[in-house]
């Protein structure tokens, strides 16, 4: 039984469309998540460079329904399945599919989305195991190779870009947004010794957390505070997610000289009387660092393939755990019923103990079979046991 075959991925990246289109599709996918609820397990990754949806056990019709969400804005999307879908996710986590090869921001964004969607009940079961493993792959690649040495992501590249325009040590800087990208920006700006640092976020507590780590000042992300930052600061970085412009005008007499827009879709209006830096402006710098990191790509790809080879065994073990937990629960209920019939707590305890003694060694044996490569046999036996005891998974 191939436990990767039920995995599907709908993929669209910065290579195919502009960041504004990605932002609009990302918002549509947020609504799609809510509509799907807790039906088919799903995981959506939306960053400044991609919108990807991973489904497990979805019917062809469900996959096409999700793909149609993309097709509202683009003519075609890439749909991949099975081991190729897992390979793609692992490569994304490793930073191998990014504009800046080896970037670390994407791993933080992947983890943020994963934690949020697991809590909401969207990402679960074997899909949860696959995404968890992708996170591990991303961390392992960055630990065992030098692919992430230097700029950590597009935020880092934007700081390099701006530092070529003015002296950052003499600059007052504001960061709008305290998520993975915004927090990374703040940490790096603090390390560069900017004159003054402000962190704005819709949730003020989150801004305070980042400010405490960077020596910055936390402010709420409101229209008034954004305007205040434009008046006081030399540079403003926007890393927030918004379907409306966060900055649509520059107040008269403002000090701001450069505005950096890392939002998807764009959060800074065009035609402003200051220098506006967008994601597309960072490609040339990214290519320079990609050339430096090229020698590490093969090492990272080897780790991805090594982890892919392990994945089927991990999924089999997890599948067996989920399956047997259900039939053990059924057996325990039967034991309690027999104990209740006997009218004795001791009899109930004895029955439960007997169930454990009989079934737990079987469970461990099935797990060992999966680890030894007898995946199909172990899965079939687990299914047979489940069906025999009366609960089919």
Curated annotation (Swiss-Prot):
Catalytic residue positions: 48 (nucleophile)
Binding, NADP(+): 177-182
Pathway: Porphyrin-containing compound metabolism; protoporphyrin-IX biosynthesis; 5-aminolevulinate from L-glutamyl-tRNA(Glu): step 1/2
Entry binding sites for substrate: 47-50, 98, 103-105, 109
Record keyword Nucleotide-binding present: no
Marked site: Important for activity: 88
SUPFAM superfamilies: Glutamyl tRNA-reductase catalytic, N-terminal domain, Glutamyl tRNA-reductase dimerization domain, NAD(P)-binding Rossmann-fold domains
Domain of life from the UniProt record: Archaea
Record keywords: NADP, Oxidoreductase, Porphyrin biosynthesis
Top-level EC class: oxidoreductase
Reactions catalysed: (S)-4-amino-5-oxopentanoate + tRNA(Glu) + NADP(+) = L-glutamyl-tRNA(Glu) + NADPH + H(+)
EC number(s) from the headed UniProt entry: 1.2.1.70
Biological processes annotated in GO: protoporphyrinogen IX biosynthetic process from glutamate
PROSITE patterns: GLUTR
Gene Ontology MF terms in the entry: glutamyl-tRNA reductase activity; NADP binding
Domain notes: Possesses an unusual extended V-shaped dimeric structure with each monomer consisting of three distinct domains arranged along a curved 'spinal' alpha-helix. The N-terminal catalytic domain specifically recognizes the glutamate moiety of the substrate. The second domain is the NADPH-binding domain, and the third C-terminal domain is responsible for dimerization.
Purpose of the protein: Catalyzes the NADPH-dependent reduction of glutamyl-tRNA(Glu) to glutamate 1-semialdehyde (GSA).
Subunit structure: Homodimer.
Note, other: During catalysis, the active site Cys acts as a nucleophile attacking the alpha-carbonyl group of tRNA-bound glutamate with the formation of a thioester intermediate between enzyme and glutamate, and the concomitant release of tRNA(Glu). The thioester intermediate is finally reduced by direct hydride transfer from NADPH, to form the product GSA.
Assigned protein family: Belongs to the glutamyl-tRNA reductase family.
Stated name of the protein: Glutamyl-tRNA reductase
Organism annotation: Pyrobaculum islandicum (strain DSM 4184 / JCM 9189 / GEO3)
Protein encoded by which gene: hemA
